[in-house]
Structure formats: C-alpha cells, structure tokens
Design a protein with these regions (language model features):
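Short loop/turn motifs at secondary-structure junctions and domain boundaries
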Residues: 47-50
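Short pre-active-site segment immediately N-terminal to the catalytic Zn-binding motif
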Residues: 84-94
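Active-site SXXK
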Residues: 95-108
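Short, surface-exposed, low-complexity cationic segments
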Residues: 73-86
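Charge-rich, well-structured scaffold segments of protease-associated domains
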Residues: 2-40, 53, 59, 106, ...
Length: 395
C-alpha cells in the first residue's frame, strides 16, 4: 500500500511536467524534441551505459560474496560490507555496532595503532569505516598494486582487533562527545525523530549511536559477542572497483576470509520486520528562529522494482538553498541542463520567489525491505503551511 503511494507520488511528479514540457518546447525548439519523447543525447547516454565495466560476483564456500568491477585504473577502492548495524541490535546493546567501528583502527594482534597508521600512510592509501542502520563498512582506497595489502589489512582489522580496555575507555569518551555534537546538528536530529516515528517500536526506529546509558556500559565482552554473532560469511560482501582483477580479488578473499564462520545449522536468523507507521511528531522550541521539517512516505527496499523510479523522482525534485538563486535558466545551456532546470527547479522557483524556505533537500533512504522517500526543509515558522502545500502539490 505504501509502495503504491510512493508510485503514485512519482507518477504525479512526472505527468504534470510532461505536459509542461510539451507546452514549453514549441515547434521551433531546436533542443528538446517532443515528437520522439527523447533527447538527441539519448544515443550517447546509451553508449555510455553500455561501456560500464562488467560486475562479477563469486561466492566463497562460507557464504561471503566477492564482487568487482575492473575499470583498468591505477587506483582501486576495496571494502567489506557487513550486515551489522543498529537494525540488528536490541534495546540493551543498541550502539554496539557503532562502538565497534570506532575500535577498528586501534590495533590488532599483528599491528599496533601506530604501525597501522604508518603502513597506510606509506602506501599512500586511505582507510575508513562507517556504520548505518543496516550495515557496518570498512574500506580502503589505494593504488591497484597495493590491493593485496589493502585486503589483508581489512581482514586483520575485523578478525584480530585487540579491543584493549584502555582503548575502549578512550573511545567511550570520544563517542559521548560525538553524541553531543550530533545533538547540535538539527538535520540529524530530525532524521532520527523521523525514523523513530515512522518505525515505531521497531529496530529501524533506534539511533545508530545508541542511547547514552548504553555507551557508558558497553564493555569488551559486548563487543566480542557482537563480532561472534554477526561477523559471519553469509552476512559479508567484499567489493572492489577500479584497477581490480576479479580472479585476484577472489583468491585474496579465499586466503584472508575463507576461515570466517558460515551460517549455523538452520541458517541465519531472519531480519526483524520493521513496519511503517504513518504518524507525526513535533518538538516545539519557540527560542529557535527556524523550523526543521521532514516529510516522508514509505518507499521501496533496495531490490524492489520501484527503487529506480523513486531515485529518478528524488533527483528531479533535487535540493535548493538561497545561495542557488531562483533557478532561472541562463544562456547558453546544454540540452540536458535545460531539461533538468525546466523539470527539476519548479519547487525551487516557488520557494525562492515566494520566500517560503531557506533550503530543501529531497531524499530517498533505502533499506532491505522498506524505505523513506521525502523532503527535508528549513523554514520560517510563518511559511511552514505554504511550503508544505507546494511540496505536496509537486508530489
């Protein structure tokens, strides 16, 4: 039902603009050819799409998937995607995945923190990690010739981290300060509230960082248990792009990740369902000069056929702030840019000329089996109703 609602929103977005393009083109327009419904650049765009490197995917015996795209570059990016985020946590251990990410680069049984930093620096590489609601990701950017070392470092980090008590206490303080910083970022606060009300009493409603009381109590045993429970072959994908040989990557995966545990008998536990609840939450503070608002409908999961149309609709609505001006088309403009400005800037023009908001940003957040499609905006309190009205009209 919700996906149908999102599809309806996408149709409402496209159809009026098709009509407006017909009216705007005119018989003498040399740029947009309405008769065929295509741009002259469509053939070139098709050729570019056909030139995308082939994606190769191979599974290991323990269930880990290996994926690559070889574009023949001199550099590469390789990362390990793990199904382990706040959606896989409960109220007691919420925040553990993010805490574990902080501990990733604090030393392993083979490398101290300093040794790891120096090795990455001497390679001219970049090592990083992040946690989302459904995944923890560790990745490295390096020269293609250093792919074997990059994969070995990633394997060492996730399998041999020392998780020292002193480092845990130090990172505990870092995370608590990070939480204070997040509270001052009103956009992040709004999106946490959006998830909390859209997915009430479900795992997707929890924050990634977790509550303060959990961060203060998480210990080494909690981190080890989380690794033991979630860092299994079927939950992982080793992916690389750039100057990457798939066969080489597959051999490296077998060497460094082949001993990871596979799924237990009976398979991995199913992902807990997260039902969408249409609702509203308002946090009022009259001392604040501006209102920060997010409006969303339930969208589709990553593998749903509606995902691509929703991504296109998200791009068409786009984003705007006052520094962009009113979206007036200047000459000369390419055919593609002209079309995008004609189609994508209507809401921006309304917001600008009506002085309805300071900024807005369309978003499409996808999860495994659900998602949120909507708009985030920053408005004066007196213009909220008008801005929401025009947003709904564009949908």
């Amino acid at each position: 039902m919700a996906a149908s609602t999102a599809r309806l929103a996408a149709r409402q977005l496209f159809l009026p603009w098709s009509t407006r393009l017909l009216r705007a083109s005119g018989s003498g327009d040399r740029h947009v050819h309405v008769g065929t419904g295509k741009l002259r650049a469509s053939k070139a765009a098709t050729e570019v799409i056909l030139n995308v490197p082939e994606t190769r995917v191979s599974p290991l015996e323990n269930g880990l998937q290996v994926a690559s795209e070889d574009s023949g570059l001199s550099t590469c990016t390789v990362g390990l995607w793990i199904d382990a985020g706040s959606r896989y946590e409960n109220e007691k251990n919420n925040g553990t995945a993010h805490f574990l990410e902080h501990m990733a680069f604090k030393g392993t049984k083979k490398r101290s923190q300093l040794d790891l930093e120096l090795e990455i620096e001497n390679m001219g590489a970049h090592l990083n990690a992040y946690t989302s609601r459904e995944q923890t990701v560790y990745y490295a950017k390096a020269f293609s010739k250093d792919l074997p070392r990059a994969v070995e470092i990633l394997a060492d980090i996730i399998q041999n981290s020392t998780l020292g008590e002193a480092e845990i206490e130090r990172e505990r303080g870092v995370i608590l300060r990070e939480m204070q910083e997040v509270e001052t970022n009103l956009q992040e606060v709004v999106f946490d509230y959006l998830h909390a009300t859209a997915y009430q009493k479900t795992a997707l409603g929890r924050t990634i960082l977790g509550p303060t009381e959990n961060i203060k109590s998480i210990n080494r045993n909690d981190l080890v248990e989380y690794i033991t429970t979630h860092y299994k072959g079927p939950r992982m994908v080793l992916a690389a792009a750039g100057g990457v040989s798939h066969d080489e990557l597959l051999d490296l995966a077998k060497c460094h990740f082949g001993n990871l545990p596979s799924a237990p008998e009976g398979g991995l536990p199913p992902l807990p369902p997260c039902s969408f609840t249409g609702s509203e939450i308002r946090i009022r503070d009259d001392k604040m000069p501006l209102a920060h608002i997010a409006i969303a409908v339930e969208a589709a999961g990553w593998s749903h056929p509606d995902t691509i149309p929703l991504m296109v609709a998200n791009t068409l609505i786009g984003n705007w702030d006052r520094s962009f001006g009113g979206g007036v088309v200047s000459e000369p403009a390419s055919t593609f840019l002209l079309l995008m400005r004609l189609v994508g800037c209507k809401l921006a023009q309304i917001a600008c000329h009506g002085n309805l908001c300071h900024s807005f940003q369309s978003f499409n957040t996808c999860y495994t089996d659900t998602g949120l499609w909507g708009l985030y905006m920053v408005c004066e309190p007196s213009t909220i109703q008008d801005m929401v009205h025009f947003v709904q009209r564009e949908w």
